[in-house]
Amino acid sequence: MKSISGNKISSTLVLLLILMASCKKNSGPSEPGNNNNNQTSADSAYHPVDPPVPPTIGFFNDVWSGKTFVAPASISGTVPNSPVTDSLFIDLNEVVVKVPMSVYGNNSNLWMGQMVTQPGLIQYIKDLSPHIIRAPAGSVSDVYFWNGTDAHPAPDDAPANLLDAGGQSVTANYWYGGNNASWTFSLSNYYALLAQTNSTGIITVNYGYARYGKNADPVATAAHLAADWVRYDNGRTKYWEIGNETYGNWEAGYQIDLTQNKDGQPGLVTGELYGRHVNVFADSMRAAARQTGATIYIGATLYDKAPAQYDYASVQGWNQGVLSQAGNAPDFYIVHDYFTAYAANSGVNDILNSANSVPSAIMNYLKPQIQTAGLSVKPIAMTEWNIEATGSKQNVSYIAGIHAAKTIGSIIKNQFGEASRWDLANGWGNGDDQGMFNIGDEPGASLWNPRPAFYYLYYFQQFFGDRMVEDNLKPANADMVSYSSSFSSGQAGTIIINSGTQNHIVSIDFKHFPAGPKYYWWVLTGGTDNRDFSGKVYVNGTAPSGPTGGPLDYASLKAYSASLNGTIRVSVPPLSVVYLVADKK
């Protein structure tokens, strides 16, 4: 055995120490203060590569545009010096998806008044910036005649009575577009609302009429009525839905009076029947669009989950029937989901957990079904979503706001092409009100007072960029979730949501980001009223202007800011959302 000289031993030890130090430095999370200022040029080189547009988004991103972040007025915020509980790493070069603006949509309805005569409400909607506002009104769409007037609300072949889910005859109560009464919403004012709020539309045509119409060919007649609307629209609206929740036993046309039907339709709607009818509607509507030189996209309704054994007949096999018969006639598919158990007094955990689980479950269910039918995956639009919880004023609480922010992030991550929350305004119902604004019947609240969900979605768009990027949150527990983004103007952002009851200190490190001198953030928290479901939201500690909702001077509030000298540290309080943007160099 040969001996080793002292010089060789010394050199070997030095090399080993260097290697060990290098391994230690790169084997775990960076320590606070060791990020941006110590990056190599490669670490701060911002060269994002956009992935292909996912088929579930498709043409909804044809109108994609970059976002420019404008730094808000700010005051110095407190940077926590407590130990870090969670570490967030964000890679600006790893683009998950270019964010479709259409995921921020909302729903109008026919009972919230003419709206365009309400400048305060219009300003709130402009600030919310939904991009898409759906019409005419959920299930009412299947008893709505867009060209009806006071003198002639519905066609002569529309029956005076319809069958309900139990097969009982009930008064039809048709709605119509030419109704200019103050309590409803005319079609002309729907178009005016879109213009005043810089929004586009998504319109649901009356499919129910194809079922309950009494003429010799009700399907062709209903399709012709839809095509006439396309002509009247004259290119203003690109996105059209054939019926609302057409599988639903609550919808007009689910069950028809066979003694009045003249084309041999079955008593109950099926997926196969609807799929065949989709072809008729699509042909008529596309012909109308060609006549006006417009481009339109037509959607068909699918059921968004596996039916339970106890579900009624029409739901069983609905998707297979639609897909087999409609084929390639639809341009996109429509789903609705209200996330929590129907009419249940759901708790905080059930509500907030659903925001993550439901969008991914929908995609995991639908895509294989479409492919099994031998069809290509197409854009998927969730044109109604909210929570179904009742009994504790959950819908008007800040928990519904956290759920809204968490859901939008999940919808983007799961690559939906469109999403419209239900709805702009509805009715108090002792706090079971899904409306974003008070229609005027909430005790003690001002007319059109924004509910907490408004604030959570307003700041989401302010501080979420045009590209979702990869992030890696190493959380202390499952309560934490993050959604990160970049702006075309160069800034980086993240939204951190704490669904639990413990305070968290989160460190944030960026990769491939030439960081600037400052970062800005907002913290949204709830109040102490109404137990778990406070009707108040505080924005950076600023209290609501009234007994419920949030601060009405939200547009002029100052963000928190701090110097960006390395790793960012931010406190995320219990049951809160933090919206943060780091400036560019």
What residue spans do the PLM features occupy?
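Flexible loop/turn segments at secondary-structure boundaries
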Residues: 111-115, 140-144, 210-212, 247-250, ...
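Noncatalytic carbohydrate-binding groove/subsite architecture in carbohydrate-active enzymes
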Residues: 270-404, 414
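Aromatic/acidic polysaccharide-binding cleft in carbohydrate-active enzymes
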Residues: 382-464, 468-482, 488-489
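Carbohydrate-binding surface patches
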Residues: 477-529, 575-581
